[in-house]
Amino acid sequence: MRFVSLAVGAALLGAAGASSISSNVGLLKANGVALGNWEAAYEKASAFVSGLTTDQKLALITGSNVESTNGNFTPLYFLDGDMGLQDFYYVSAFSLSSALAMTWDRDAIYEQAKAVGSEFYNKGVQVVAGPTSQPLGRTPWGGRGVEGFGPDPYLNGLATGLTTKGYVDAGVIPGGKHFLLYEQETNRTSSFGSSGEGSPYSSNADDKTIHETYLWPFYDAVKNGAGAVMCAMTKVNGTMACENSDLLMKMLKTELGFPGMVWPDMNGQNSAKGSALGGEDYGSSSIWSTSTMESFLSNGTLSEARLNDMAIRNLIGYYYVNLDNGRQPTRQTTDVYVDVRANHSKLIRENGAKSMALLKNEGVLPLSKPRVMSIFGAHAGPIMGGPNSNVDVMGSGPTYQGHLATGSGSGMASMPYLITPYGALTNKAAQDGTVLRWVLNDTYSSGGGSSLVPSSTSSTAVEPSFENFATGSDICLVFINALAGEGADRTELYNADQDAMVNTVADNCNNTVAVVNTVGPRLLDQWIEHDNVTAVLYGSLLGQESGNSIVDLLYGDVNPSGRLVHTIAKNESDYNVGLCYTAQCNFTEGVYLDYRYFDAHNITPRYPFGHGLSYTTFHYSSLAIKAPSSITKAPKGNLTVGGPSDLWDVVGTVSARIANNGTLSGAEVPQLYLGFPDSADQPVRQLRGFDRVELSAGQEAVVTFNLRRRDISYWNVKTQQWMVAGGKYTVFVGGSSRDLRLNGTFFLWVGS
């Protein structure tokens, strides 16, 4: 949800039972976590809090100004989001996180985060409500999957960590969200009647699933400097996430060593006692009123140590990113002219092009000065009300009647402008002398006898229809999208109107290219095998430069290198997880999401996770594996910020030679997948490495993947540790989860 400051003014749900904790679990300096480079920030925060009265500490943790003998503190200002500042003028609209993940480019992910963070910093905003690791994408029907980095924990985790680091390096506090298991919009706040007692749904998952899938990316966030974490508005295993001490005090603050503050999503704080004891550190002054909290202190419900810990956690991120140095510009009202965009439009255009995946190409792309080109679909052009028209998915249809380049709710950017494909293609046609025709509608059939369309056969005018414009065109571009976002899940994974448009155009045009921008998996089987559908570009939402990014790819100014971050199935029924419509949402699929499920059940996808083509070709060879012959079963390192210190140690490497054996320069994304010994009870194979390597025609390079201890570990529910299984590991390197060109094995002997 949107945040404008540390002041929760939303209506809060009735009280519910809270988890209880032992006295010192999760408290800084009492939980056994070595703070490392957070130590100086802790000392500053602790010194400030030591001079506060109880009332001042309560003011601090409820977002009020604090004036003390130690100095003054103004409440932090929180704002969405990962795609750029909301509600401000003169800011950039970046690609959404799901698009950025499709670049599979560590540098691109980091540089965008640093650019976003710099705009927050220069606008006087202290906290980014992001990165958005979750929703992870448990179900393709989930409305907010577009805001995250995809359903693979490894890829999601690396992107989450790099984004966190980018924000920190820009001088702002990253606020990772949503913690935890928040995977759909349906019934996130709704009443279920007497059985649900007006509560949101409960996501119920076992310990192994939580650790190996949903908690995994938060390790990366914490390791890379997250100073805040937003607890979700829903329940986890029957307890509100913001009151769940197992999640917050045990897993997040102790196991992961998180030193920062936990603050609630809207409606996330349910009761004063439950949230205070459960692990929330910032709350509403109407719930944590002075009288209520002082009564908790006096009767022993809340300890002074816990209150001090809450106060310190509210400050530690501020000191960690050096916001106390006084250099940050003062925040102005949203419409005051403070232009913070720098040259970010160039970065947005480049990342947008890097992110789109070429799924199919039968030699039609790249384009070269076509004589007659027709474009079709509402997604090609602008919406009538402009790019900042409110994208409200609640009550809207499954598609957007204009070019979709940003999300909704917390995923919506403040557009300074929007380059549509129609606009960019018009400029290109003018340069090339191309005749350009268009129907910017998904269901248009004829001109209706308009007097503006002459009927004379000697005229060059053509009565506008899909059939008429497609006939005689050298190239036909059909633009389609899929809409969903905060507040509403998806109702379909394909669209009858758009699919009929593609088929109609393809029936009349032997070079039909489909351009798809979607909020999640979008089925293509209604037309993908049509003989005249000769190419498909597929991506997420690209931000203000969207049209330029797409045209750069269509004409070959950029060679496609994007890769899928989800599996595209042939049928909706191929996916194993749908939406949950009951109060209890049981994650019975465990760790088997997306390609892990498809592999386990030998389901053939239309396009696999990691797939993407290029205008050139690449050859893989020379697999080399360097792994230890033995390793301890469990990590032995100290508990640090980010978990046991040696969980992050590199314990082996895998390398392969990649050669560009085509005729054009391009970038390849080699991917490493790992198969575990049977005793680890893991999926068939899991992503455990990737790289993006740019190669000129004829050039080759050796790519090396580092295997960390955590990459070869599984969660042992009995010992409550990350453990390494002894036995045979199988290594696969290739271009997708199904395009596995090299393979090898290594054996590990595991000692105590």
Curated annotation (Swiss-Prot):
Pathway: Glycan metabolism; cellulose degradation
Protein's name in the database: Probable beta-glucosidase D
Domain of life: Eukaryota
Record organism: Aspergillus flavus (strain ATCC 200026 / FGSC A1120 / IAM 13836 / NRRL 3357 / JCM 12722 / SRRC 167)
Matching InterPro entries: Cellulose_deg_GH3, Fn3-like, Glyco_hydro_3_C, Glyco_hydro_3_C_sf, Glyco_hydro_3_N, Glyco_hydro_3_N_sf, Glycoside_hydrolase_SF, Ig-like_fold
The family this protein is said to belong to: Belongs to the glycosyl hydrolase 3 family.
Catalytic residues in the record: 265
Annotated GO biological process: cellulose catabolic process
Chain positions carrying an annotated carbohydrate: 187, 237, 299, 343, 441, 510, 532, 571, 586, 638, 661, 743
Assigned EC number: 3.2.1.21
